[in-house]
Amino acid sequence: MKMSIVIILLLFTCLIATNGASGTKCSGSPECVKFCRTKGCRNGKCMNRSCKCYLCS
């Protein structure tokens, strides 16, 4: 019983972490550059229809 609660909590934590890590939806990298610069990052790329920001301070 305790093990199943631990597994459920672990899955719930993973779902929250992946949801917070995802960027905005995109169709091309130029959209992400503007979005990432507003967040304080130097560059951004569109990967799997989601913005990924790089070189953040």
UniProtKB/Swiss-Prot annotation:
The record marks Y54 as: Aromatic residue of the functional dyad. GO terms for cellular component: extracellular region. PROSITE patterns: SCORP_SHORT_TOXIN (PS01138). Changing K45A: Complete loss of inhibition potency on human T cells (IL-2, TNF-alpha and IFN-gamma secretion). The record marks K45 as: Key residue for immunosuppressive and anti-inflammatory activities. It comes from the Eukaryota. Keywords: Disulfide bond, Ion channel impairing toxin, Neurotoxin, Potassium channel impairing toxin, Secreted, Signal, Toxin. Residues 1-23 form the signal peptide. Gene3D superfamilies: Knottin, scorpion toxin-like. GO terms for molecular function: ion channel inhibitor activity; potassium channel regulator activity; toxin activity. SUPFAM superfamilies: Scorpion toxin-like. Disulfide bonds join C26-C46, C32-C51, C36-C53, C41-C56. The record marks K45 as: Basic residue of the functional dyad. It is found in: Secreted. Its main location: secreted. Expressed by the venom gland. This toxin shows both immunosuppressive and anti-inflammatory activities. It has the potential to inhibit human T cell activation, since it reduces IL-2 secretion and the expression of T cell activation marker CD69 and acts as an anti-inflammatory agent, since it provokes the reduction of secretion of both IFN-gamma and TNF-alpha. In vivo, the delayed-type hypersensitivity response in rat autoimmune disease model is ameliorated in the presence of this toxin. Acts by blocking Kv1.3/KCNA3 potassium channels of T-lymphocytes. Belongs to the short scorpion toxin superfamily. Potassium channel inhibitor family. Alpha-KTx 23 subfamily. Negative results: recombinant toxin does not cause hemolysis in human erythrocytes. Has the structural arrangement of an alpha-helix connected to antiparallel beta-sheets by disulfide bonds (CS-alpha/beta). This is Potassium channel toxin alpha-KTx 23.3. It comes from Scorpiops tibetanus (Scorpion).
